[in-house]
Amino acid sequence: MPASGCFAIEYREALDLARLGALVIKSVSPKSRAGNPTPRVAETRGGMLNSIGIPSKGLDHYLREILPPYTAFGTPVVVSISADTVDEFAEAVAQVSLPCVAAIEANISCPNLEADGMAFAMAPDTTYEVVSAIRRRTQHPVWAKLTPNSSDIAAVARACEDAGADAVVMGNAVLGMSIDIRTRKPTLGNVMGGLSGPAIKPIALRMVYQCHRAVRIPVIGCGGIASAEDAIEFMLAGAQAVQVGTASFIDPGAMAHIVEGLDAYCVENSIEYITELTGAVRIDPQLSDRWLRFAQQSG
């Protein structure tokens, strides 16, 4: 499935949307926002930096103009919500809990204005607070999108599970920065931004593994996935599904190629259900006790 913010309805020209597991739409906030100052995107070696700021025209516009076209393909639609406060998250989830929506992805990796701008998902306590508030306002499945910038991702994932999340999405972009040596200015208008693409894949893969070890709810892997081989790695690490982001900017047909590659891998390896791959990484038993304790306890 696409990662939120990396997909638009125009992709129907490049691939069969009915073959995707879900359509995840760009995050919407309950109030209008202009987004961050330009430049908002900068290419880096092995990836890209972005500081978009999640521009939004508000929920009314989103529900009236953005959401309806995505419901025409028979593929489950996942609405991603973003907010500045716990109350705004609760308000947003209540409004998007519609029959045409299959699940709600809460982008809790965004800044929490009630905690000096620290992302909700940076700490277990703020994670639990916001996910609990969201859970109380909807009967829809709730996916909590985490940040790789957390120092204890396993504890954050457990807080999501304890608060009632149905899945965790691991994860968003890694905070980064680049500078133009000619102008000596940051390449992004907001100075720092999220690093995505192949450069962050080993980080994201490690965190998916840690989340899988820490919780019983499904883990959705995201971060640097550009091929079927990448997707298989994430599933072996513990992901039950994957999201594709930056790769689709380079090749709009990337997700179609990944689906085809997964089909071929399953045929070649006599795999009846792709879920057989989830968590099937082979760890040396002599290393497992010490290493897995570390992996489960640390972030």
Residue ranges of each PLM-predicted region?
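Extended, intrinsically disordered, low-complexity segments
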Residues: 201, 260-299
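N-terminal capping/small domains of soluble enzymes
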Residues: 1-77, 83-84, 258
